[in-house]
From Swiss-Prot:
Induction conditions: Levels of this protein are positively controlled by the second messenger c-di-GMP (at protein level) at a post-transcriptional level. Increased levels of c-di-GMP lead to increased levels of PgaD.
Gene name, Swiss-Prot/TrEMBL: pgaD
UniProt-recorded name of the protein: Biofilm PGA synthesis protein PgaD
Annotated organism of origin: Escherichia coli (strain K12)
Signal peptide as annotated in the record: none
Residues in compartment: Cytoplasmic: 1-23, 75-137
Membrane topology: Multi-pass membrane protein
Chief site of localization: membrane
Amino acid sequence: MNNLIITTRQSPVRLLVDYVATTILWTLFALFIFLFAMDLLTGYYWQSEARSRLQFYFLLAVANAVVLIVWALYNKLRFQKQQHHAAYQYTPQEYAESLAIPDELYQQLQKSHRMSVHFTSQGQIKMVVSEKALVRA
């Protein structure tokens, strides 16, 4: 995902804290998994009544993993093709026609960074006065 919708800048300290916390938590998670697997191999869990409960949790985890994998594959197939078409590139003449103004007035709109736009009573653009002309007047 190179084109993120929301991008926020973080300070290097905040980024470092995030990376360190993530590394510590993943290390602890791996340690807990390792210790649990070692206890399973020693046979202690298999001698108690917790065996059926552990089997249920294991089957539940496997079913959850299967559902997540199927859902991810479905989304990959669903969103594999680009659904949004690129926006149509209008020409300056088409813009001028859509605003019902002459090409010269459209060019003046394009050149001005700051302007005052005057409209007719029907809401069409009548005149554009750029900021330079406003300052001189």
